[in-house]
Amino acid sequence: MCVYIVAGLGNPGPSYDKTRHNVGQMVLDILSGGARFRRHKTNNFYLSLGDILLVKPDAYMNLSGPVIASLMKFHSVSDLLVLHDDIDLPLGTLRFKQGGGTAGHRGLRSISDCLGSDYARLRVGIGRPENNQSIEDFVLSNFSPVQTDIISRTIQLAAEAVLHLRDNGFVGVKQFIAQTKSPSRT
């Protein structure tokens, strides 16, 4: 029986796979251990890890709310953890947050419009653009080689944090993040 839905935000298609905006889905790829996600009639790709259902919405990030909401209804699950990029956190930083605003993140806004704002988030810091690059171009670009090393370690830690849902729920995730040193910026 599914107890938690863990949704990794990102955009669909191979051209977005390695972009900053897709770090939430990158965490799910680590958790899947190479297993293939299956398509669900609610426009999601999913993979069950027992009591945790990993979900990749098959919609652009700013349209992810309706597909996540329909899957939650289908499985009668009320506990949601959303994995997403955050430009307000330095590269390599992880933060757990229960409820709250969207900070301008369109994927979170879409989810909040459908479900309200009382859901958990695991924020993955991607840093801010430099050299007057627009935020849109920045989040849709790939990481540099140095940044890739940092974000790879961060994504691994985020995947480990998600597994703490099994034993201690959201408290376990929060405690793991608080006790873990985020990969340092170089």
Curated annotation (Swiss-Prot):
The active site is at H21 (proton acceptor). One of its GO terms (biological process) is protein quality control for misfolded or incompletely synthesized proteins. Keywords: Cytoplasm, Hydrolase, RNA-binding, tRNA-binding. The record marks N11 as: Discriminates between blocked and unblocked aminoacyl-tRNA. InterPro entries: Pept_tRNA_hydro (IPR001328), Pept_tRNA_hydro_CS (IPR018171), Pept_tRNA_hydro_sf (IPR036416). The record marks D85 as: Stabilizes the basic form of H active site to accept a proton. It catalyses: an N-acyl-L-alpha-aminoacyl-tRNA + H2O = an N-acyl-L-amino acid + a tRNA + H(+). It comes from the Bacteria. Its EC number is 3.1.1.29. It is found in: Cytoplasm. TRNA binds at Y16, Y60, N62. GO terms for cellular component: cytoplasm. One of its GO terms (molecular function) is tRNA binding. Monomer. Belongs to the PTH family. Hydrolyzes ribosome-free peptidyl-tRNAs (with 1 or more amino acids incorporated), which drop off the ribosome during protein synthesis, or as a result of ribosome stalling. NCBIfam families: pth. This is Peptidyl-tRNA hydrolase. It comes from Tropheryma whipplei (strain TW08/27).
